[in-house]
Curated annotation (Swiss-Prot):
This is Queuine tRNA-ribosyltransferase. Disulfide bonds: none annotated. It comes from Nitrosomonas europaea (strain ATCC 19718 / CIP 103999 / KCTC 2705 / NBRC 14298). Substrate binds at D89, S90, G91, G92, F93, D143, Q185, G212. GO terms for molecular function: metal ion binding; tRNA-guanosine(34) queuine transglycosylase activity. Pfam families: TGT. Binds 1 zinc ion per subunit. Its cofactor is Zn(2+). One of its GO terms (cellular component) is cytosol. It catalyses: 7-aminomethyl-7-carbaguanine + guanosine(34) in tRNA = 7-aminomethyl-7-carbaguanosine(34) in tRNA + guanine. The gene is tgt. Residues 243-249, 267-271 are annotated as: RNA binding. It is an enzyme of class 2 (transferase). Its EC number is 2.4.2.29.
Length: 371
């Protein structure tokens, strides 16, 4: 892996990330393909949209289709016929999401499979082995996602466990030529975030992620922790904010020096009939669009906006036609990829601060509420 920074505009960074399966222009947004597919879209469509890297989920792919199937294809790229880079989450967040179904100990996490009820045991070593079979371009360490809300004592214990698992992850990753990223934890406590970041930097990783955010905390707390944590990470390594977020969240995080993002919002909201547009969020189920023959966004050149009207998409949403979810997903992911391209251009030209004003504060939120 090679990461090259080309320029900055204050803390916002413009770079290039070179990985085994290709080059990623940063800041970049990674569409989420949890089960080895971005819901409803083909790899060719993702390329056309401008996606340079996608995300897969170790936990879910381990359970289905399983390592035997993935290994028979020679890895996740050939299984899903995607020739670009792939980042895989380690499974820590998904195990955290199981709640009472899982039991955490020093060695790892024991849980009941949500697929068939079998008892499973996931450790840092097993997570690294799975991701090696997947042949992920970027491998994430196995960590415990600190719950929210939680008191400082529990958050510290969780953070320390994640640091010990980080060391084990790096040891188990030895010999794998693909990149390995550490994950900063520590909940909503700045001092714990400092300790986590320092510990990970001492171990040494190819890149660093900020985890444990967008887990139910108020946005003000998320932004506070992000502002505090990002400067603690090495300037010459890529920085990844996990699971975030809205267009406004992304622009705010780029201003703090973040390079990589992933989130299910564009595709999940697409399936629910929410489209991101230059005028804010368009809610297709609203009856006001029943006779609206205008495109979803007059300023968008995606396939959906060039070929279909709001009235037709409203009809598809109301009738539950799968074409509607596909067309909406094409539009939303195009919106996100265009947003990232515009961010990169703004940084290159020294105009990022002006660009960010369009997505900050009350003006953008009023647009979202009124379209």
């Amino acid at each position: 892996m090679k990461f090259q920074l080309h320029c900055r505009d204050h803390e916002a960074r413009r770079g290039t990330l070179t990985l085994a399966h290709g080059t990623v222009e940063t800041p970049a947004f990674m569409p989420v393909g949890t089960y080895g597919a971005v819901k409803g879209l083909s790899p060719d469509e993702l390329h056309t949209l401008g996606a340079g890297i996608i995300l897969g989920n170790t936990f879910h792919l381990w359970l289905r289709p399983g390592l035997e199937v993935i290994g028979a294809h020679g890895g996740l790229h050939r299984l899903m016929n995607w020739d670009g880079p792939i980042l895989t989450d380690s499974g820590g967040f998904q195990v955290f999401s199981l709640g009472a179904l899982r039991k955490i100990c020093e060695e790892g996490v024991r849980f009941r499979s949500p697929v068939n009820g079998d008892t499973c045991f996931l450790t840092p070593e097993e997570s690294m082995r799975i991701q090696q079979v997947l042949n992920s371009d970027i491998v994430m360490i196995f960590d415990e996602c600190t719950p929210y809300p939680v008191d400082m004592q529990i958050a510290e214990s969780s953070m320390q466990l994640s640091l010990r698992w980080a060391e084990r992850s790096k040891t188990a990753h030895a010999g794998n030529p693909n990149a390995l990223f550490g994950i900063v934890q520590g909940g909503m406590y700045e001092s714990l975030r400092d300790h986590s970041a320092a510990g990970l930097c001492a171990i040494g990783f190819d890149g660093y992620a900020i985890g444990g955010l967008s887990v139910g905390e108020p946005k003000a707390d998320m932004q506070r922790i992000l502002r505090h944590t990002a400067p603690q990470l090495p300037a010459d390594k890529p920085r990844y904010l996990m699971g975030v977020g809205t267009p406004e969240d992304i622009v705010h995080a780029v201003a703090q020096g973040i390079d990589l993002f992933d989130c299910v919002l564009p595709t999940r909201n697409a399936r629910n009939g929410w489209l991101y547009t230059s005028q804010g969020i368009l809610r297709l189920r609203n009856s006001r669009y029943r006779l609206d023959t205008s495109p979803p966004d007059e300023h968008c050149d995606c396939y959906t906006c060039r070929h279909f009207t709001r009235a037709y998409l409203h009809h598809l949403q109301r009738t539950g036609e799968m074409l509607g979810a596909r067309l909406n997903s094409l539009h939303n992911l195009h919106y996100y990829q265009r947003l990232m391209a515009n961010i990169r251009k703004a940084i290159e030209t020294g105009q990022f601060e002006q660009f960010a004003r369009k997505f900050s504060g009350q003006d953008f939120m009023l647009k979202c509420a009124s379209v």
